[in-house]
């Protein structure tokens, strides 16, 4: 039972991190669609702040043993790729 609870906590922690990553992607989409251009300092600051916050969340979860370091890095890498593709699509308009 204890190992099931540990697995459940690990799964829940990773799911919460994925939700936070998706929130960042949605926030940047809204910003690009409605508010600012990717070259705008406000856009860059929001993106940097959000990515830094997520990286700290992931680091904390890794240190607690709730998320594997590789999985955390993969999550950040995937988000960075998605944001890059979004940026490229926006600037190609």
UniProtKB/Swiss-Prot annotation:
Pfam family of the protein (one): DUF1507
| InterPro entries the UniProt entry points to | UPF0358 (IPR009983), UPF0358_sf (IPR036270)
Q: Which Gene3D superfamilies match?
A: SO2669-like
Q: Which residues form the signal peptide?
A: none
What does this protein do, in the record's words? Essential for cell growth and for normal cell shape.
Query: Of which family is this protein a member?
Result: Belongs to the UPF0358 family.
NCBIfam families, per the entry: PRK13666.1
This chain's protein is named: UPF0358 protein YlaN
Ranked from the top, the taxonomy reads: Bacteria, Bacillati, Bacillota, Bacilli, Bacillales
